[in-house]
Amino acid sequence: MNQSEKRLFLIQSLLNERPSCQKQIIPTDSERQKILLRGLMNVRRAYPIGTEFLQVQDAYLQGETAAKGITDIADLTPIQPGLYLWQGDITTLRCDAIVNAANSGMTGCYIPNHRCIDNAIHTYAGVELRLACAELMEQQGYPEPTGQAKITPAFNLPCRYVLHTVGPIISGRVTKADKELLASCYRSCLELAAENKLESVAFCCISTGEFHFPNDLAAEIAVATVKEFLKKQTSVKKVIFNVFKDLDKAIYEKLLRAD
């Protein structure tokens, strides 16, 4: 199967799971097919699926990521020893672990084609990631607290693992507790990475965007917490601050070049 044939197979398989979608007309152009496939993956609950689907899905997603272009941490230049700034799609980054800004349900974003990082990571990792997260949450038995972290395989992403953390949600002014919880997100991820003997971790901008933490303050907390952790003797030697917006890139550049 080529990529187009794989995509159609995956779409039809997911439609067949949903009785209400049996008469869904599949678009003919590739971009609309991609939107439909992503949406179907986003709304699919965490239950097992057949081996053939997984084999086709894995080949398809790895092909899509390869087409976007993979960035290897080995090809990046640090701004400071052990500290990197990289602007781009975190789902195309090859390092030991990337960090997902999750919600307390911890099984991904269920809004079709939502532009949050949780949605993107679950989409390009594949349905296995939601299943793995659901197993962890079933074992835990309660929603994920803010400021902690969990680790899963990365499945079809170029990285090896995904670190999932729930950042604080800001509804008014930022409190001292909010700042401490955000710092805890970074610290918990780094501690979990060290426990698993990982060397490189890429952080997204936790709690900014959908969770409304001010970008500049969030970056200050991120940089300070990471620098403090790197003073310890652990396996973690390289940390990437991954940004998507020009605004965040400018904020991090100023912070990292100030020293």
Give residue spans per PLM region.
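Macrodomain-like recognition of ADP-ribose-binding/processing modules
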Residues: 1-259
